[in-house]
């Protein structure tokens, strides 16, 4: 098989539905070559084979496998019966909420809300979302590894008086609870990433998520305790990686390039310090050599090629349509929004819900997409601070920019690069949507020209660069879900 594929189950996801406006179709720049399969298939008693994704933090799925569980006790069954008797509209709503997107999506929503509230810059937001979803992915993979090793029957099978609520997978072991493992991993990572948020508040969400497994009659308390412990242990691996990924480096303030043709603070804010100048040296997840992927330099300032690029920006901004302005504002992902990476995760979320993906599939889609964008940010910022390219407004201060130009070098476009990476990954997983996803990426990169922030070459090279990065992420993964 040449692509990583998911069944679409019906109509394709309209980009107008997802983005509220469309753009003319475009073609993919490449087809994925065959990718060697490294899937592990788990077959629980009475169940069907499960294609298990790769781990990103653990060396193997069984690295942190918990010890075998004891037999469930009568006391555990009685506890579930008592909780069942107390079910209400409130508990039923909580059960439904924490089961959305197979138990993964609520934590994506929590993270995106934190990105908005704390006003994380796009690069930091992309890094945070990758750490979170890598941890969730590994927690799910490890939980399913343990389920395969230790089969434990559902409480409702052991005690028919228990009426399980929510999704039921016959033949799947309840030990450990994958939902609790997700909660343990996600809460541990989010506490590290967002110290502004109180530990108690995030831990309360983890407890709420885990408790719904009991309220629904889906798991024994020992399943939940084991899942939380497993998830928290994996979350600590993500924290350790985050502490060593180079993101705590401080810039010494020295400029490689200065003078005409190089980035300088731009009107109207004239922010003196460029954003995240060290991000190009952060550790990547799937790209083995950032410098080897670095694009060639842009046209030199003042040359005919550069003048043609600047004229293209003048023309685009002068002829900007209301729809193009709307697109530029949508894709901007400015401070106080979910960020550009968050926009692509919202697209992924809608596709996950449309196709009703299971827990393993959902965790995998979000991890691959987030990791591709995090690596794309690093590679893009490596190019930005290698070339220190001037922004278009430095060549023509009369440009009609839509809002203030971002405070960092122009070449290449971060929006174009991460959009190319995200669309390549999602298009590889959802091949029937690849054309629509590519069109979204093209619109995202064009939006930066329409806003007056980037030359066409910034966007075109960035998009191609991102597609290459997305392909590398897919090549690290398996061929089927």
Predicted regions located by residue number:
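N-terminal secretory signal peptides
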Residues: 1-13, 17, 24-30
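Short, intrinsically disordered low-complexity segments
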Residues: 8-15, 19, 37, 204, ...
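Intrinsically disordered, low-complexity segments enriched in polar/charged small residues
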Residues: 17-21, 25, 184, 420
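C-terminal segment of classical bacterial N-terminal signal peptides
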Residues: 30-36
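Acidic/polar surface patches and capping/hinge elements
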Residues: 40-481
